[in-house]
Amino acid sequence: MEVNGEIYRVAGPVVTVIGIKPRMYDVVKVGHEGLMGEVIRIKGEQATVQVYEDTSGLKPGEPVMNTGLPLSVELGPGLLESIYDGIQRPLPVLQEKMGNFIQRGVTANGLDRERVWEFKPTVSKGDEVKGGNILGLVQETKNIEHKIMVPPSISGTIKEIKAGSFKVDETICVLTDGTEISMMQKWPVRGPRPVAKKLMPTKPLITGQRILDGMFPIAKGGTAAIPGPFGSGKTVTQQQLAKWSDTDIVVYIGCGERGNEMADVLNEFPELEDPKTGRPLMERTVLIANTSNMPVAAREASVYTGITIAEYYRDMGYDVSLMADSSSRWAEAMREISSRLEEMPGEEGYPAYLSARLSEFYERAGAVNSLAGLDGSITVIGAVSPPGGDFSEPVTQNTLRIVKVFWALDAKLSQRRHFPSINWLTSYSLYTQGLADWYSENVGADWTQLRDDAMDLLQQESELQEIVQLVGSDALPEDQQLTLEVARMVREYFLQQNAFHPVDTYCPFDKQYKLLKSITRYGELATAALESGVPMNKIITIKSKDELAKVKFEENFDAALDVVMKKMDEEFAQIGGN
């Protein structure tokens, strides 16, 4: 190991070194074991390094080597179905090398150098190519065609292009200036990949979760935050989104959360089928596991590694969704590193640059036209874990300033066993208006009206609840009693959803539309019956109303709903409502 510097001081994950003359964010190898670290501050001859591995046992005087390169990820075929740690070391490879517990100083390539891929060129000798252009295709999984692109900084005329089976680091293309291009490229994680232009998000991300799709939709290329106290369902909601959202690629970052949550994902995803393709969900997924017992500094790296991989697939024209669970743990890591650096603390001890770092991350989301002329998107959904469910704390507040969708999880709802426990009164989506045209064309012309009516009902219910708690619902006029009843149906029949039920876990948009329309239909029939003098107790005791609650669990939903709605019309006719 070439020694060109040494350790001066060690303070937890922060190490001060002298004699290496680095640039900001250069990767350095620290100590005799060559622990990986990144330069985060330079002051005179001293450089401060955050180390991405455990620093126990390091001492002043140990050697430090500067690689001269920024922290980069390897991009190419073989990313899908992988599970990495925060600095893109494949965990299965590390397990083979050293067993179930990660030891220090072990390196592993992000992409398998021995695996062979079949490359089919789409360009010819003599063609002009520039950064981002597609050279050829590799079938990475059964449904994902991996487009091999020219690295963004390279352009020229093709002198030679090969076809056949190659390893990722073998040359597949040579330009006239002698530049060799392989299937693999490296990209520094802190810099966003270039695009031709950013686009307005116009299509919704269909998640199969009724409260998200129906009430608070997110667009493909949008940003969302899921804040909530412990046990309110953040991780289950994130996993539901990773399982069922209609994107091509999912990048799931477990950032500082429990290890058994990542184990759940690893156990479930290979067995679950993608509703679009019928293939195992793992085939479209990249997992980055940086659990709470791993070094805190690597949490920052894991977030940047994940978004860079997402950008790479976006540049191929794919829709990517990225789940970060949880950005609060990353912010806590920033706070710890900042305090070790003795920086002036901001609100609640977080560094003053917390907002800048969060926006830097979320701004890498978006719908774009790539350098290859293809439309792709990254949808970023970040969980936030405010201590005690306090939404006024800095991480939640700074995140809310950046994102356009706010899914507020409520501990009271989760205690009442209402899941997903997203509070419909405090949540919001700023994409609703922009997506209205899409809903009119693809779902139903009356969808927006149905949604607005349901939200009005829930708002009225919340206002009436204050009176009900004082005097009871029987003291209300009958029309207000009916409002409470229909609002309860919207809550229990539509908003509640069982993530562990084989049918109800995923609800297609067509089914959501029909279910909400049937509840609205009951409200219309009941109002007409009430106005024609039918007593309230007869209206709320009809059997078809209770049967409507069970329809969403039926595999043959359309047939079951038709039977219930026909019965409802008959029952209202019998009691004199029609």
Swiss-Prot record:
What do the Gene Ontology cellular component annotations say?
plasma membrane; proton-transporting two-sector ATPase complex, catalytic domain
Q: Where in the cell is it found?
A: Cell membrane
Origin superkingdom: Archaea
Report disulfide bridges, numbered on this chain.
none
The membrane topology term of the UniProt record is: Peripheral membrane protein
Name the coiled-coil region(s).
Answer: none
Q: Which reaction(s) does the protein catalyse, per the Swiss-Prot or TrEMBL entry?
A: ATP + H2O + 4 H(+)(in) = ADP + phosphate + 5 H(+)(out)
Q: Name one GO molecular function term.
A: proton-transporting ATPase activity, rotational mechanism
Q: Which Pfam families match?
A: ATP-synt_ab, ATP-synt_ab_N, ATP-synt_ab_Xtn, ATP-synt_VA_C
Tell me which HAMAP family the record gives. ATP_synth_A_arch
Entries under PANTHER family matching the protein: H(+)-TRANSPORTING TWO-SECTOR ATPASE, V-TYPE PROTON ATPASE CATALYTIC SUBUNIT A
Q: Which family does it belong to?
A: Belongs to the ATPase alpha/beta chains family.
Q: How is this protein organized at the quaternary level?
A: Has multiple subunits with at least A(3), B(3), C, D, E, F, H, I and proteolipid K(x).
List the NCBIfam families. Answer: ATP_syn_A_arch, PRK04192.1
Q: What is this protein called?
A: A-type ATP synthase subunit A
Species for this entry: Methanococcoides burtonii (strain DSM 6242 / NBRC 107633 / OCM 468 / ACE-M)
Q: What gene is it encoded by?
A: atpA
